[in-house]
Amino acid sequence: MWSFANDRFAARVYFCSNTAVPRQRNPIRPKILIFDVDGVLVDVRGTYWRSALETVRHLSGKRVTYAELHKWKSKPGNNDDWAMTAAWLTALGRPTTYDEARATFEKFYWGTDGKPGLVRNEKLLITPVQIQRWAKRYELNLFTGRTRQEFSFTFKRWAGTEYFRRVITMDDAKKKPDPEGLRMILDGRDPAAALYVGDNIDDALAARGARVPFAAIVAAGDAGYRQRMARFRELGALALLARARDLNQLLVK
């Protein structure tokens, strides 16, 4: 058994890519896998990220970039896109409330007046077959910053959904980085028996708060990815992975 505070594991960080993947001398043996959704199971670059950019551009009248978006996403407390866009707009000199940011964001995300929303651009990054394989070996759960409505829209027809024991959305628990959602999933069980896989600083902070080991998804080439890698190392990530399926390189077979 291993624990989050074990420096031997925390110092052993891997970045899996399309090239050679280093052999794991210390593979891990969790019993429970907990996944974030956005950036882990679902590609949200054309949906949530784009909606955030369009919201800031629309309300501020200024041209903003994905590089700026990543700087804001890397700040603790900004896993909530509505809170992030409100803070971003205010910093640009256009004071914006949470409710105004959310209302504008959702117009781009869901669409209005018969105009399709960006939500239709969402793409799943993991196949149901891979989820089924993991489900044969581990208990699977989800802890996401999505609302229940957003989660259901994307996952209601996905065959992999049935394999998750529990799904905790932002409607069910306090927002990340609060670890309440992870603790609800554990339900008194040993945190060291789990592994949380996420792509956001708030995911890592929630894992640390719940004393759950953490693996970070960091796609090479994304704006600011080197800075995010360094920050995840500081927070004790067991591994840095290019994509969720690289988790297979980390787990004991």
State the predicted function of each range.
Residues L59, P128-N141, G145-K175, E180-R189:
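Substrate-recognition/cap helix-loop segment adjacent to the acidic, metal-dependent catalytic center
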Residues L41, L140, Y196-V197:
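Conserved SAM-binding loop
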Residues E139, A193, P213:
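Residues at the starts of beta-strands that form the adenosine-phosphate
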Residues Y196-L238:
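Acidic, Mg2+-coordinating phosphoryl-transfer loop and its flanking beta/alpha structural elements
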